[in-house]
Amino acid sequence: MISTANNQRVIVVGGGLAGLAGTVRIAESGVPVDLFSLVPVKRSHSVCAQGGINACNDVARQQGYSEWEHFDETLYGGDFLQHQPPVYEMAHWAPKVIDLLDRMGVPFNRTAEGQRALRLFGGSLYKRTHFAGATTGQQLMYALDEQTRRYEAKGMVNKYEFWEFLRPLLDDQGRCVGIVAQDLRTMQIRSFRADAVVLATGGPGLVFGKSTNSVMCTGAAAARAYKAGVKYANPEFIQVHPTSIPGADKLRLMSESARGEGGRVWCPAVKDDAGNWKPHPEPGKDPRQLPESERWYFLEEKFPAYGNIVPRDIATREIFQVCKDGFGVGGGNMVYLDLTHKPAEELERKLGGIMEIYRKFVGDDPVEMPMKIFPGVHYSMGGLWTTYTPGPDYDKIKAGQMPVQTPASGHPWDPEKRPAAGMDPNASNNMMTNIPGLYAFGECNYQYHGGTRLGANALLSCIFDGLFCGRSVANFVAEHADDPASSKPAAIFDNGVDAEEKIQNNLISSSGDENPYAIARELGEIMTRECTVVKDREGLEKTLTKLDELRDRFSRISVADSGMFTNQNLSWARAVGDMIDLADPIARGSLEREESRGSHYRTDFLQRNDERFLKTTVATYNPSTRKADISWEDVEHGIVTPRVRDYSKGKAKAANNGSKPDDASNHHDKSTSNGPTGATDPKDGVRAARPEQAPHAGAGQTIGSTTEPNT
């Protein structure tokens, strides 16, 4: 328990899973928390998460799974762009996180024996995803909100709902000592002192216009921190989810859990005399009348080991390409996600949430009719730059001084005896930005997912950030007990309020001829077209030119409503300017990363280039140009050697001889896989193949179990 003399306290901005978990952990440490949220916390975007949360448990362990496997497949899925210590720590904390949530009362689905049920999810051949139907995010949110209200009742948490973060406040040494925020009901702007500030504000989906994100997910808070001096990392890595429902207002997610539970992706097609697939002559024909011979299960055909549960960037590009090649439903931009072969009772029990969404917004019943889906912008792997302190064993492993006993060498992975190669739990800088005292948790930081996030790792990373790194925040507060925010000059806070009121007055008094809603629409259109599924130099340069135009036009906007009570036009107009500023590093990072890695796919640079780009993109805001200056930071990969990412077969496999293969970056299993090829079994959607692993970077040992999972 930390003593908080001098009225020390912490501000958490964002009431989603990362914000609530952090609030609970910090309050538990004895530090009072002021919790700010645009909406009532139970309405935060985390409630929209559907599929599940990844972790190893005893049942998964019986398949041959382990925390090490979770760690490795997360790196492999992310194309090795993550710093490895944070991912290592997260994978080993995952079982504890699930146990804690279970004790909090989260209604996880159960097996007949009472064990927590597990489902398949993208990027893994093991069932290791815990779930609560298809409303997992909502159930986790409600559990953490109950714990937050427990501390609220004790006077340790004050909620400021319907308040918007405007800027961080820094003292003369550059330390964050508070924020300026605005009451969205009265439009009052005021300052708040804090000894540390946590941003847990989610992703920038609205930068792309339509997305699966809630309409409040503008990325404005991260943009304001970025413009205040926080670096922004890997902005070009934007995840486009392969299965969403197009809508006039936004996109609605059809969870990856549908594929994990046996859903099959296909398009109407016929084979020519040479056996090649061709677009169907009647692409709009009732899918229920199409025989199996006229259904192209293209993911299962191209990726036999993983089938429909390949990682999202791969599935998205394949769907995008078959539609571009004329195979889409009705000749358009949709394919089928088919669950009609599954029992109705099972679908309602495991996927009831998304079934209800599809019926409501489309009008068809997925039990009877294959769903029509198309990829949609979903998640940002990039975010505010953060740091951490690695555990004491990391440098020894990196230098080859501490061999790691892995499953492949005949040693079961024991999480209790694991090397301390993750993050130091006693450090005060875990997930701190380059501004001391300012932290970033959840989707608005960049640490865990690299080039592509594996499904069901998002909820884990959010809650892990809050629970593990919340302790770092409390430690930072304790370290600065002799220099509290309460002792800082009033001018710091008054000047911040004055600056924000000036920005607001300029917006209200602006009498230009530009409509901020039209600017936002054009921004979303070009960002979606040029900065998502496929990219090239011409399109990215066109985007940067368009951003210059939009930036100029934004200076001439007119806000329709000049009132000072619940003025949503004013709040939106300001966010549009921030979205333009955040779009710049996304496009600029995409242009300067001349390779294809994870979700970043350049048609003019099709290969991954580790020599030049096994690095973090770091964007720094330049106030004079209002654009990003791009630099590069080496990625820490001292535990697992990066290797080629190839989901057409199991994960890369090395000889089990205790030494590195000649080429640790490119060694694939050329032998015939034991058992089924991995195509979906209509009965249960289970894979029988297993992924193999590459050697440990420090000790040169083969890592990965030789045991086939019993699924």
Residue locations for each model-derived region?
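An anion/pyrophosphate-binding glycine-rich loop and adjacent beta-alpha core
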Residues: 224, 230-365, 369-372, 403-418, ...
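Long, amphipathic alpha-helical stalk/connector segments used for oligomerization, subunit docking
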Residues: 476-566
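Conserved redox-cofactor binding core of oxidoreductases
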Residues: 97, 102-188, 193, 200, ...
